[in-house]
Regions:
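Non-catalytic helical/linker scaffolds that mediate oligomerization, partner binding
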Residues: 1-476
Length: 476
């Protein structure tokens, strides 16, 4: 691959990137993870694209990962009868009993408990907050009467946000359960859950994965509701990664509060040593233009400097005119800023004496020693991928080279900052294995004569136990 960036790029699949040639060009330009958006997914189409990506991985030695993104409990209005414009002061009834074409006076809502959950005075937001209504009354069964506060075109199937309402929807809808089972069958590398409000939401998905998969599939919690922000500490203990989903979050909370929430969530994720993805509207103008705005360039750069593991593109790659060029531009921005000394890493050392304490401590010191001796790379042998997460979290200047015989984590770890993975299944004595992976790193041009290299391994190596050994080598 032509890029040596450490921050990863997640690109959403869609009609704009449906050919093998475009997917290959996107990987070459810097895509590390492809996202399947199950809000707009046809199973046969998704399976075909996943097969194409895995075919490219096999043929060219790529490690592109697949992220399945579940829609979650998304509220929507029904189909409108005609072009409807609502004006401030208009009165409109939302009904849940019957899905009839909508008019200026009455519109269907796909959420049966809506009349029971809302209260007078609460807001209803439509179409990413473009329209705002205030609840006047509810009959608690099938109808809610609301007044238009902010008007405009009321369009079919547009999303609904209820920022002041505690919704009683399940975290996993029936559609999500079907989509998750399909994603598990496709052996996706990561599953993201939308609108996570509590740790219990994640436990439901964990139980579903355990029931249908022989392997653990790591879960990313998408934070896009105020409750998710409030409960972030308990959510972090039950997920494997975070996504700051700024689209719905910027509707559910005032948009001007999102920048500080983003920084807070990134800091929490880094402190917990789990990966974090920044998503939504990063290069939005590049859907139709070859040039991003200065504000978009700054947004990508600032997200990298906040410490994001990955930045994500949605419409830019799924339906945009320039799916390859937007990746090239994003890679350019990342490479320009990610080595900045202004990027801060939380220096909280492992304190709690868990059974992973030794591994955590060795990974921390490997990263710090690599910076001190200006090592070119940190090589680790891993079966679970745990050491890769831990080393990456300390953001060493050295490359993180992961050698594993576990084919599932070859692609899974491609989301993690700074990590490059290689298949390796010749585990002999510790000394011989370390010499062997160092030779491979040299052959691949990742280190050269005179470079310092740090190796992490478990002794005895055949047991594939927890890392307990750190060795420094000068490449000869």
């Amino acid at each position: 691959m032509s890029t040596n960036k450490k921050t990863k790029i997640v690109a959403t699949l869609g009609p704009a990137c449906s050919t093998r040639e475009v997917l290959k060009d996107m990987i070459e330009a810097g895509v590390n993870v492809f996202r399947v958006n199950f809000s707009h997914a046809d199973y046969s189409d998704v399976k075909a694209k996943i097969d194409l990506i895995r075919g490219l991985n096999d043929e060219f030695g790529y490690t592109a990962a697949i992220l399945g993104d579940l829609q979650g409990p998304k509220l929507r209005v029904g189909v409108m009868n005609e072009e409807v414009i609502v004006n401030p002061g208009d009165i409109i009834t939302f009904q849940t009993a019957e899905d009839v074409p909508g008019t200026k006076e009455r519109v269907y809502m796909n959420y049966k408990e809506f009349p029971n959950d809302v209260n007078p005075g609460e807001n209803i937001l439509l179409d990413d907050g473009k329209l705002m209504f205030e609840v006047i009354s509810t009959n608690r069964t099938t109808e809610v009467v609301a007044k238009v506060i902010q008007g405009g075109p009321l369009k079919s199937k547009k999303g609904v946000n209820l920022p002041n309402t505690k919704v009683s929807l399940p975290a996993l809808t029936e559609k999500d359960i079907r989509d998750a089972i399909f994603a598990i069958e496709q052996k996706v590398d990561w599953i993201a859950l939308s609108f996570v409000r509590t740790a219990e939401d994640l436990m439901e998905l964990q139980d579903l994965i355990a029931k249908h998969s022989d392997h653990k599939i790591p879960i990313i919690a998408k934070i896009e509701k105020p409750e998710g922000v409030e409960n972030i500490d308990s959510i972090i203990t039950h997920c494997d990664g975070l996504m700051v989903a700024r689209g719905d979050l910027g509707v559910e909370v005032p948009a001007h509060e999102v920048p500080l929430i983003q920084k807070k969530l990134v800091h929490k994720a880094k402190t917990a040593r789990i990966p974090v993805i920044i998503a939504t509207q990063m290069m939005e103008t590049m859907i139709t233009s070859l040039t991003p705005t200065r504000a978009e360039v700054n947004d990508v750069a600032n997200s990298v400097m906040d410490g994001a593991d990955a930045v994500m593109l949605s419409g830019e790659t799924s339906v945009g005119n320039y799916p390859v060029q937007v990746i090239q531009k994003m890679t350019q921005i990342i490479e320009a800023v990610e080595d900045s000394p202004l990027i801060q890493v939380p220096q909280n050392t492992p304190q709690i004496k868990t059974n992973r304490y030794i591994t955590k401590t060795i990974c921390q010191h490997a990263a710090q020693m690599a910076n001190a001796i200006k090592a070119k790379a940190i090589c680790t042998l891993t079966n679970s991928g745990y050491t890769a997460f831990q080393i990456s979290a300390w953001r060493p200047q050295a490359d993180i080279l992961v050698f594993t015989s576990n084919k599932r984590i070859l692609t899974q770890l491609n989301l993690i900052w700074g990590v490059k993975t290689f298949y390796y299944d010749k585990f002999v004595s510790t000394d011989d294995t370390i010499d062997d992976v160092n030779r491979i790193a040299t052959e691949k041009g990742l280190v050269t004569k005179g470079d310092m290299l740090i190796n992490l391994a478990a002794m005895p190596i055949a047991n594939k136990g927890m890392v307990n050994t750190l060795r420094v080598t000068e490449i000869e």
